[in-house]
Curated annotation (Swiss-Prot):
Principal cellular location given in the protein's record: nucleus
Name this protein carries in UniProt: Transcription and mRNA export factor ENY2
Gene3D superfamilies (UniProt xref): 1.10.246.140
Organism: Danio rerio
Pfam families with a match to the protein in the record: EnY2
């Protein structure tokens, strides 16, 4: 395991242990709904289903077709806020 992987695992573990991961997930969920991202993603899913036909689409197809666009649609402000929260948490709980 690379040093970066070990660090990511340690950070993730600390976020989970302190309950911060769940709080961050809830914040992210709320922000994505607030900015309309969720509605945009629903529309993308409907588009993929319409193009391929409901009988010809698997969940895997949907995920593969929507994930890159979905990630690109997340507003920078939401990404920045989440990153700031993570940094603040780590600064407060660094060992």
């Amino acid at each position: 395991m690379s040093k970066e992987s070990q660090m990511r695992a340690a950070i993730n573990q600390k976020l989970i242990e302190m309950g911060e991961r769940e709080r961050l997930k809830e914040l992210l969920r709320a922000k994505l709904i607030e900015c309309g991202w969720r509605d945009q993603l629903k529309a993308l899913c409907k588009e993929v289903i319409k193009e391929k036909g409901i009988e010809n689409v698997t969940v895997e197809d949907l995920v593969a077709g929507v994930t890159p666009k979905g990630r690109a649609l997340v507003p920078d402000s939401v990404k920045k806020e989440l990153l700031q929260r993570i940094r603040a948490f780590l600064a407060q709980h660094s060992t």
